[in-house]
Amino acid sequence: MAAVADSVENNGSINLPENENLIPAGFSAAALLDENSGAFPELNQPDSLAAAETTFPDTNDSAEERWPGWPGDCVFRMIVPVTKVGAIIGRKGDFIKKMCEETRARIKVLDGPVNTPDRIVLISGKEEPEAYMSPAMDAVLRVFRRVSGLPDNDDDDVQNAGSVFSSVRLLVASTQAINLIGKQGSLIKSIVENSGASVRILSEEETPFYAAQDERIVDLQGEALKILKALEAIVGHLRRFLVDHTVVPLFEKQYLARVSQTRQEEPLAESKSSLHTISSNLMEPDFSLLARREPLFLERDSRVDSRVQPSGVSIYSQDPVLSARHSPGLARVSSAFVTQVSQTMQIPFSYAEDIIGVEGANIAYIRRRSGATITIKESPHPDQITVEIKGTTSQVQTAEQLIQEFIINHKEPVSVSGGYARIDSGYVPAYPPQLSNRQEPLPSTYMGTEPVQYRPTAYSQLGGPSTYTPTLTGQTYGSEYRPASDVGGYSSYNL
């Protein structure tokens, strides 16, 4: 005991086994802590948090590491029907003012061309990296709730209103659309699978005339709640595309410049079209009079073009010398706006096969013959379909006439031995001639609900591969048609 006491007095500790260093040789305390760091969850930050810290510096950093206006603004452009603008603004602007105050974002409905049924809602707000949902994202979802009729709060009425078919579109840059698709379509596919809504990027031919050449449309369709989930995922992905606060006004200025350009070109184009109509009816001796009048309009055209000012700096590129006169996007806008018309027809579902045809032969023929863009959509009524026709006035009229001809030639089902009869060239049905009682053209607002049985008709030399897949559960009339490769410029349409 005396030896033990002497050791304690001289060394200050007792040389017991539990006081020996148990860390193996070659290992430091720091290395051992790193190996056992799994026991401390707070020490294992995920890669996403590390990336977030790299992308968005800490708020305690000095101001010298940031730039003026850091981190930037989020900008979203929603395309809504003009009939829904009142639901966004409210009486005396109460709704839009309340949304701006609650979300701390800027919401503005831009003026559009007179003949277009759409309006662009410009939504912008300063990005908040620490927030789960930025002010601009919150404003986008609130605007969609107002447009689709969803209540602001998640209550019992949400399930009833959320099952209604709805749609919404976003106007984005081409680079954002490509990024949204992802590698081999993986990103947009995951959004569709997780939300259950239909999400697609419209082609350049389907892009509206008021969009620039480097812009695309993101189209969402489906039930309102599913669209809301998909819209949240899309804007959550696009929130990384930030712009400086000084760039936000350019979105509105360039859009209004394109609109004003089309308004200036409209009366001039109408004058030219009337002149060409007169020239087609003139006789040979009057050709000299036409030759004297034509240069007047050409001179007027040059004077109008000379007054057009440059459009300024491009939002998505570094080229500051794009001009309104030589911009291919503006040239396409002015030429398309002059006679752009949109017409909607409500057709009984019993005539769907007559309009579409076997393997889409009839609808492909109508598109080729008229040159119009024809989209078949679902109707709020289960026994009807909506046919939307877009194009010039003559194209829309031709398409309507062809559709009415197919409806008039609708045949009642009869029993034919041996299946289909011999098919002659042209567009003669394969059934025995039996005229239908419906011999009057169907108006665009036809709301008839008379159930009519029908059988598929076949037309020669118009076949093409097609696929019919249901798009909405619980609806026996939902299908998707993909036209043949020989019909270019037209994407799928939903029934």
From Swiss-Prot:
Biological processes annotated in GO: gynoecium development; mRNA transcription; negative regulation of long-day photoperiodism, flowering; negative regulation of short-day photoperiodism, flowering; RNA processing; shoot system development
Any one GO molecular-function label of the UniProt entry: RNA binding
GO cellular component, one term: nucleus
Keywords: Nucleus, Repeat, RNA-binding, Transcription, Transcription regulation
Ribonucleoprotein keyword on record: no
Record domain KH: where: 73-140, 165-234, 340-403
Tissues in which the protein is found: Detected in roots, shoots, leaves, flowers and fruits.
Alphabetical list of PROSITE patterns matching this protein: KH_TYPE_1 (PS50084)
Region (Disordered) location: 474-495
InterPro entries: KH_dom, KH_dom_type_1, KH_dom_type_1_sf
UniProt-annotated location(s): Nucleus
Disruption phenotype: Subtle morphological alterations in pep-2 and pep-4 such as leaf alterations, phyllotactic errors and sporadic presence of small fruits with multiple valves. Occasional asymmetry in valve growth and unfused carpels. Rescues the flk mutant late-flowering phenotype with a concomitant decrease in FLC RNA levels.
Subunit structure: Interacts with HUA1 and HEN4.
Functional summary from the UniProt entry: Regulates vegetative and gynoecium development. In concert with HUA2, antagonizes FLK by positively regulating FLC probably at transcriptional and post-transcriptional levels, and thus acts as a negative regulator of flowering.
Protein name: RNA-binding KH domain-containing protein PEPPER
Organism of provenance: Arabidopsis thaliana (Mouse-ear cress)
